[in-house]
Amino acid sequence: MTEREALTALRGDDVAQAARAAGVLWQMWHRSGDPRLDGLLQEGIEAMQREDLPGADTTFTRLINEAPAFAEGWNKRATVRYMAQDYAAAIAECRETLARNPNHFGALSGQGLCHLMLGQFSEAADLFRRTLAVHPHLGSARDNLRTALSEIVKLN
């Protein structure tokens, strides 16, 4: 399955096919084309899983410095910074990811979560809508959109 085919399947009516397509996309997005860089990505992911956020951040920064065009390096550093509750920095990293891969539903949703945490509900709602335009079956984005819209109503 090509990336284009996977993105098309995400938008289809078959939920199981969309889930498979999402998995295919994540696999594609985790491959840089260079085994050494893929090893750095894996090293950073393992540091995140150990909750070694400084180590993960350092590893992803090395990856970004060596392969600035590799969107997933930026996305993973965004995740680390979100986990560290540095939402402004995570937003900047999500933007870098999206500049390289505009269909990265993980970065779209992640940026939306950052705006939600900052109380920027309109921005969050917009990002969750954009996420759902790419991946309509992503339940967390649907739930987070409802939350953002509910908060907007409370403010008005």
What is the predicted function of each stretch?
Residues M1, W26-G39, L155:
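TPR-adjacent "capping" and linker segments in tetratricopeptide-repeat scaffold/adaptor proteins
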Residues L7, G23-W26, T61, R95, ...:
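Alpha-solenoid helical repeat scaffolds
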Residues V15-A18, L53, Y87, F121:
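TPR-repeat structural position
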Residues D34-G106:
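Alpha-helical adaptor scaffolds
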Residues Q49, M83, M117, S150-I152:
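Register position in tetratricopeptide repeats
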Residues A133-N156:
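Terminal, low-structured helical/coil segments at or just beyond the last alpha-helical repeat
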